[in-house]
């Protein structure tokens, strides 16, 4: 589950209108099939971490420094996050696919974090791939943060679009700034 609405300042049009709450669950079991994790990539870019922060809240150290009222909410530099995502997400995907020992063209779907449809389209273009391989559901739910990939994966399964043996790349990115991709054989 991911709940970002609690951390957004209601009058901040740069965050409050973008983030929503969502939850999804995926059951993973050993069913005797050859489904497996084939490759992964995880990268952090702390030097740009202030571009997307969760803000300070009651769950943090109560004995720490006093914080300004302004820094208690999620804050985002949308332009910086867009530039980060459109540069680093394709790199992460390429590295994970290479680690998996397959080609980009072997991937049936790239299940990306649903932060922004423009980011998804730009990543597809940078990888020279059709948007048909990049399902999008942000128009239904908004940005549900960490829940967006499992929600999209569950929808693909429910729609009968996934079959045993399909190669999938699941990619998330966000605060920190961080990006991660895992390539699986479904």
Predicted regions and their residues:
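Claisen-condensing/thiolase-fold acyl-transfer catalytic domains that form or cleave C-C bonds
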Residues: 90, 108-186
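Conserved active-site "lid/cap" helical segment
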Residues: 57-108, 119-128, 152, 156, ...
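Short, solvent-exposed loop/turn segments at secondary-structure junctions
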Residues: 5-10
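Glycine-rich anion/phosphate-binding loop at the beta-strand->alpha-helix junction
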Residues: 1-2
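Condensing-enzyme catalytic core mediating Claisen C-C bond formation in acyl metabolism
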Residues: 11-83, 87, 91, 173, ...
């Amino acid at each position: 589950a991911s709940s970002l609405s609690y951390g957004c300042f209601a009058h901040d049009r740069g965050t409050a209108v973008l983030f929503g709450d969502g939850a999804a669950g995926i059951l993973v079991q050993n069913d005797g099939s050859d489904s497996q994790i084939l490759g992964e990539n995880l990268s952090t870019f702390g030097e740009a971490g202030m571009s997307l922060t969760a803000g300070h809240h009651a769950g943090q150290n109560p004995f720490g420094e006093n914080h300004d009222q302004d820094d208690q909410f999620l804050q985002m530099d949308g332009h910086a996050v867009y530039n980060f995502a459109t540069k680093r997400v394709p790199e992460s995907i390429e590295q994970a696919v290479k680690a998996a020992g397959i080609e980009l063209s072997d991937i049936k779907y790239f299940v990306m974090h649903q932060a922004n449809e423009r980011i998804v389209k730009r990543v597809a273009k940078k990888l020279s791939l059709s948007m048909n391989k990049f399902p999008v559901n942000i128009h239904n739910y908004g940005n549900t943060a960490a829940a967006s990939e499992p929600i999209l994966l569950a929808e693909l399964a429910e729609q009968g679009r996934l079959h045993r043996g399909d190669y999938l790349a699941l990619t998330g990115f966000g605060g920190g700034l961080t990006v991660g991709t895992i390539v699986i054989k479904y």
